[in-house]
């Protein structure tokens, strides 16, 4: 029924019951999960998570997240390149720019973020891989960098920008990740934007264990998981006046096209 294009399934939050989380997702129609990295010290854990036998297809992506810029070292970029060259990574990610927190706006760390992003975009070009992009308070800067270092394709994770920014990303060959924000009553601008975009402009994502759907949070939930993608599907279906099945199938087609995922068996 659906592919979760962004879930940190390797996270320690899932250590106690990862198999049960996967089973619940599979029971609700999730057919595959893209698992992006964020720090070099998690690369091995992520690789092992995606390699273990599972009810679902698990696809790894490797990258250095901008929020951890202070911890990233030059050798981590080399480690990333080794993984891209020797594993079945489907994307470079989660990478990007973040100016949301005050410390990330420090001139030295901001420059380092840009340098790391440029290096990782170059790796994506070298290995002909799409990218999974993170941006907070930095859409304009990210668009500018992408115009200089054009990726082959990719996803703008958790998009919540303006209409002109959405079209700028689409013009660069990217699509927009739609997650739990779409379920929030305050997300009217995002819903209005999605109504005005082509039907192949977005993919679905949980961002689990983060970004809880509004209904789950209101009910006292504290950990997101891929099965909750159903809430995002329902909210987007209502927004677009389409059926949930149509939304899930359209998103799966777009995810497979953008990330060039292998075909799934009908039984999966």
At which residue positions do the language-model features occur?
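Mid-domain alpha/beta scaffold segments of enzyme catalytic cores
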Residues: 1-268
């Amino acid at each position: 029924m659906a592919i979760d294009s962004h879930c940190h399934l390797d996270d320690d939050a899932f250590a106690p019951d990862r198999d049960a989380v996967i089973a619940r997702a599979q029971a609700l129609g999730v057919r595959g999960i893209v698992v992006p990295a964020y720090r070099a010290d998690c690369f091995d854990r992520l690789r092992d998570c995606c390699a273990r036998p599972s009810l679902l297809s698990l696809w790894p992506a490797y990258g250095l997240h901008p929020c951890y810029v202070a911890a990233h070292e030059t050798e981590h970029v080399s480690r990333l390149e080794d993984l891209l060259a020797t594993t079945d990574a489907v994307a470079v990610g989660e990478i990007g720019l973040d100016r949301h927190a005050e410390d990330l706006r420090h001139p030295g760390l901001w420059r380092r973020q840009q340098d790391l992003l440029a290096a990782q975009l170059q790796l994506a070009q070298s290995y002909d891989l799409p990218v999974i992009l993170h941006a907070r308070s930095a859409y304009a800067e990210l668009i500018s960098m992408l115009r200089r270092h054009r990726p082959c394709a990719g996803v703008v994770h958790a998009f919540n920008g303006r209409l002109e920014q959405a079209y700028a990303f689409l013009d660069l060959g990217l699509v927009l990740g739609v997650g739990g924000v779409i379920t929030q009553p305050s997300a009217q601008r995002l819903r209005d934007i999605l109504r005005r975009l082509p039907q192949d402009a977005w993919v679905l994502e949980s961002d689990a264990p983060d970004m809880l759907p509004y209904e789950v949070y209101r009910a006292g939930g504290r950990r997101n998981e891929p099965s909750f993608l159903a809430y995002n599907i329902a909210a987007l279906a209502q927004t677009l006046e389409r059926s949930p099945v149509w939304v899930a199938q359209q998103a799966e087609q777009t995810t497979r096209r953008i990330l060039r995922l292998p075909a799934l068996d009908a039984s999966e």
